[in-house]
Every structure is written in C-alpha cells, then in structure tokens.
C-alpha cells in the first residue's frame, strides 16, 4: 500500500466527522481543491502533532514547505475482476438495417462478452519546483483476460501535466496524454493536449470550490476535434463532495464525434464509508454510414465504495441509443479492485 493510501485511511478513521478540515482530507478527488480547503480550514488553529505531520506531507506534494526533496515515484500492481461488453473489439450480433437494405455480419467478427480478470500496473511521478508549481506524470498498463473466450486485450496510457500557480487562487495546467488499446479484432489510439485555467474560491454558505475552463485538442485514429471543457468541484460545508463537468466538441465532418457531454459526481461518508455516485449524459453526432446520418445518446451511471483499506467495488450501467439501431447497446459493469 502506498504512503498516500496509508495517510488516507489514518485520516478516515481518526478525523471523520470532526470538522470541515476532515472533509478536505477525505474528499481527495481534486488534490488542489483539497489542499486549498486544508490551508483555509486550519489557518490560525491549533492541530495535534500527527495531524500536522500528515497535512505537511500532503502539502509538500504541491510545493509547500519547501516541496519534495527529490522526484517522488510511487507504483502499484493490483488485480481486478470485471465484466466486459466487448472483449475482442467485434461487431454487434445483429443485422445492420439501413432503410430497405439489410446486412449480416461475419460470425468471426461478432463481439464477445463476459467476465474478465485484469492485472493493472500504475506508476506515478511528482517533481515540485515551487509553491503550486509541479510536474505530474502518470503511467498505466493493463492486460485483461477472459477464461470463457480464451481471449484478452491490453491497455496502455501516459499522461503528463505541468501545473503553475500564477496567483494566490489561480493556476494554469498544461497536460498531454497518449493512450492505446489492442484487441483481437480492433485497435484504438488517441492523443490529447489540454490547457486549463483554474480558480479557487470559498463561500461561507457552500464551502470550498474550484472552477476550471479548459481547451482540449483531441486526436483519435479517425478524427481530430477541438473541445471546450468547464468544471466546478466543491467540498461542501456539510461534508460532501460534488463535481460538475461539461464538455462541448466542435462538429467533425462525416465522423461520429462528441457534441456535448455532462457528468455529475457526488461523494459522501455514509456509515463510516466513503460512497461515490456519477451520472453521465453524452450526445455524439456527425456520423454517416452509407448515406444515413448517425447520432448516439449515451447515458451512464456509476457507483463506487471502499469495502476495506485495500479493496473497492464499482457498479455501473451504460445505455447507448443510436439513430441507427445496429449501434444500440446496453450493458452492466461490476468490478472488484484490490490494491496492495
């Protein structure tokens, strides 16, 4: 178990429900917001030695108190069990109907569904330069295997972000990422470059918030798109966390691509356990298949909770409603993740 996870669970059992500052520590989905909440909450107050040590260690990762003495690496290797709706990257097991035309797919290219076991490897690096100025790099790789179909697939990604504090409550983040997925039938690659402006705020009636305005340049195997991103994260006075994400993409000629997407996220401590819920609504359009326009509406719901310091459960459901029935889809997700 890495040092940050140890810190989290020490706080989980010792600080839960005691003050607003406990929310700053427990709701760590947004590191910058969590640290801002901490600094504002403990200013002018006396804290015990252990709490001060934990807070200092956390804030050093963002460049406070002299920052990290050297570049900090952390790694984790963990399995999970999940359900995949398309293990081999195949096509739906139904005919494609376009007007009066009907097409049948090759049975060898039909998608496979079922339980998969996955081995995941993560490596994270943090280097600090000054208060609020740091470089974060995240590496990820995984291999998933289905015993039922004797088949598997791999994922790999790298993301690097430079964060620069330009004012007491404002920062600029520049990020670049590359990802790849290899399946038996299909392969997908994507790249993105983003520029984000962040603003931190405190409202005595609501709590601590971070608003972000971002520009994203996204490129996949088949199209390139520019996107506008807006987000608003809040650690509420009532000790719960909320997040709103809105993303809008420019039209892409003759390619199905994001038109807009909205995600709502919530986290709260219930019965001494952190519980998170997410709701997503996405609309994609612009696609054309044999002269027929295609647009998709995707709705997702996700639920996540910790069942122990080293295990979490994720439940979810995805529904896709397409203007071309062939691409309609719906599937559940259920996974158990164990870390050490």
Model-derived segments and spans:
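Classical Sec-dependent N-terminal signal peptides that target proteins to the secretory pathway
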Residues: 1-24
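Outer-membrane beta-barrel transmembrane domain signature
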Residues: 91-99, 237-243, 247-300, 304-306, ...
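Repeated loop/turn-to-beta-strand initiation elements of outer-membrane beta-barrel proteins
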Residues: 129-137, 165-176, 200-211, 235-244, ...
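Residues that define the transmembrane beta-barrel architecture of outer-membrane proteins
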Residues: 113-121, 143, 150-158, 187-193, ...
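Outer-membrane beta-barrel architecture
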Residues: 122-126, 159-161, 194-198, 227-233, ...
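Outer-membrane beta-barrel "beta-signal"
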Residues: 312-316, 327-340
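Outer-membrane beta-barrel initiation region
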Residues: 23-159
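Transmembrane beta-strands of outer-membrane beta-barrel pores
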Residues: 79-85, 127, 141-147, 176-184, ...
């Amino acid at each position: 178990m890495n040092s940050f996870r140890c810190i989290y669970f020490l706080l989980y059992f010792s600080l839960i429900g005691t003050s607003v500052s406990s929310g700053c520590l427990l709701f760590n989905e947004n590191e910058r917001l969590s640290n801002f909440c901490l600094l504002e909450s403990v200013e002018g107050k006396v804290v015990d030695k252990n709490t001060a040590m934990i807070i200092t260690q956390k804030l050093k990762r963002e460049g406070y108190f002299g920052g990290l003495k050297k570049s900090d690496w952390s790694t984790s290797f963990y399995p999970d069990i999940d359900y995949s709706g398309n293990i081999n990257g195949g096509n739906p097991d139904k005919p494609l109907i376009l007007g009066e035309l009907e097409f049948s797919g090759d049975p060898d290219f039909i998608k496979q569904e079922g339980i998969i076991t996955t081995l995941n490897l993560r490596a994270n690096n943090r280097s600090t330069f000054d208060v609020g100025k740091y470089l974060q790099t995240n590496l990820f790789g995984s291999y998933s295997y289905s015993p039922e179909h004797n088949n598997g697939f791999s994922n790999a990604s790298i993301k690097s972000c430079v964060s620069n504090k330009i004012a007491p409550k404002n920062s600029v983040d520049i990020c670049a990422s590359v990802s790849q997925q290899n399946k038996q039938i299909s392969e997908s690659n994507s790249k993105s470059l983003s520029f984000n402006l962040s603003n931190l705020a405190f409202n005595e009636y609501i709590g601590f918030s971070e608003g972000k305005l971002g520009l994203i340049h996204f490129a996949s195997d088949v199209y390139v798109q520019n996107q506008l991103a807006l987000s608003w994260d809040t650690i509420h006075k009532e000790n719960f966390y909320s997040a709103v994400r809105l993303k809008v993409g420019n039209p892409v000629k003759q390619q199905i691509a994001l038109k807009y997407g909205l995600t709502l996220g919530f986290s709260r401590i219930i019965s001494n356990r952190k519980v998170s819920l997410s709701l997503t609504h996405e609309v994609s359009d612009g696609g054309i298949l044999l002269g027929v326009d295609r647009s998709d509406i995707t709705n997702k719901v996700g639920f996540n909770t910790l069942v122990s310091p080293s295990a979490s459960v994720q439940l979810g459901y995805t529904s896709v409603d397409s203007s071309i029935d062939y691409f309609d889809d719906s599937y559940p997700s259920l996974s158990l993740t164990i870390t050490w």
